[in-house]
């Protein structure tokens, strides 16, 4: 089984697939770790034999902690091969496998990217700090404690534009995701991502992201980024947020 995990760009993936197609053993299964690109586009231009052996296995990030894995196959892929991949991911890798339709973002990112996008838009409009936004958009709604900005740091801020472009290129302009994206553009959030990446702030794998650890004083101090001016200051956990208190009590 060959798993492709390169950049979330269709042209880059096609280049890798062409090389795999030349060297792979006949009948070997090939999968892509794409998080948003439809399978139909991934196999376009590839041989019929390649398409019969090709599926999507979307590992959620970070894969060493998150159990969820999405599988997307096609009508030309035999059910036996789908079962082989599903069993391997379940038994050998310990994943919780969900078989999805071939739609933009599949299930997880069709919901997750929209939720994150809208959350960031509302944070900007409400003048929230990244800590306030993450406190609200995390445990109180049953989401991971990273929230939205912390999650962006984990995933990689440099990856976000590629994921976004993949989604908007495969959805109707009237889709709520595309509508929210236009609002993000107007608020300057897309430009913020670009500026951060250019400066090396790609998240945890870089100099930091919306959060960073500053060790200039000799000890590591957690700092957060001001969404308006881009400056960093000591990260302060918000207290007495009404929505957080309500979540702890339970919605009754």
Predicted feature locations:
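N-terminal glycine-rich phosphate-binding loop for ADP-containing cofactors
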Residues: 1-252
């Amino acid at each position: 089984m060959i798993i492709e995990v390169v950049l979330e760009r269709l042209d880059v993936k096609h280049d890798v697939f062409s090389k795999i197609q030349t060297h792979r053993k006949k009948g070997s299964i090939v999968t892509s770790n794409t998080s948003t690109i439809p399978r139909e586009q991934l196999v376009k231009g590839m041989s019929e034999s390649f398409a019969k052996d090709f599926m999507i296995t979307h590992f959620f990030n970070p894969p060493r902690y998150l159990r969820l894995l999405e599988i997307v196959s096609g009508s030309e892929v035999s059910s036996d091969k789908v079962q082989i991949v599903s069993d391997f991911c379940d038994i050998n890798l310990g994943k919780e496998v969900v078989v999805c339709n071939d739609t933009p973002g599949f299930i997880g990112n069709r919901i997750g990217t929209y939720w994150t996008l809208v959350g960031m838009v509302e944070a900007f409009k409400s003048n929230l700090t990244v800590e306030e936004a993450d406190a609200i958009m995390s445990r109180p709604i049953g989401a991971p404690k990273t929230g939205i900005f912390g999650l962006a740091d984990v995933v990689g801020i440099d990856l976000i534009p590629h994921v976004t472009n993949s989604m908007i290129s495969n959805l109707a302009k009237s889709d709520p995701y595309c509508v929210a994206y236009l609002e993000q553009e107007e608020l300057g959030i897309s430009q913020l991502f670009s500026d951060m990446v250019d400066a090396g702030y790609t998240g945890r794998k870089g100099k930091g992201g919306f959060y960073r650890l500053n060790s200039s004083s000799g000890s590591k101090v957690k700092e957060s980024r001001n969404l308006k001016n881009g400056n960093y200051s000591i990260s302060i956990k918000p207290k007495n947020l009404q929505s957080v208190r309500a979540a702890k009590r339970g919605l009754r």
